[in-house]
Amino acid sequence: MNQHSPLTVIAVAVVLSAGSVLVGRRRDDAADAPGRDEFPGGKVEAGEAVELAAARECFEESGVTVNVGQRLHVAQATSSAGPIEIHFHRAAPVDANVSPLPPFTWLKIENLTRCHFPPANAEVVRRLLADEHAG
């Protein structure tokens, strides 16, 4: 990895519906965080707004169309390609009855404690669990 690699911005949709959150699992052969759980997201294209990228990536990965809302958290991390900045945004499905494409599924928020997310997701998971316990 080049120490002068440009920063890559990642947009993530944290899709919430009826006490559940949309979660998938990365492929075992993924370059970064293989086999780890994840929220849908990916790279922000040049000139693209982070919120639009989160919605686009969510649909591309899970088949779920979402309305993207407030930013939950921004995390810094390093991927195999260099430094990344991850923008996590709260989102809601346009259709609450939609079935996501594998490997994504609806998971009760309290079950997030059983998941194995990359470290950059820890603050978002903590907040979701705290909000769930607060009612």
Where are these regions (language model features)?
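Charged phosphate-binding loop/patch that engages nucleotide di/tri-phosphates or the phosphate backbone
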Residues: A120-G135
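A broad helix-preferring feature
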Residues: V9-V12, E38, H89
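Short secondary-structure junctions
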Residues: E61-V68
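Active-site-adjacent beta-strand/loop module that shapes the phosphate/pyrophosphate-binding cleft
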Residues: V66, V74-T105, I109, R126-L128
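Conserved Nudix-box catalytic region and its N-terminal flanking loop in Nudix hydrolases
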Residues: S20-E60
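Conserved N-terminal beta-strand and adjoining loop/helix that marks the start
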Residues: M1-L22, K43, V74
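A generic structural micro-feature
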Residues: Q3-L7, A33-R36, S80-E85
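C-terminal structural segments of small proteins and small subunits
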Residues: I109-E123
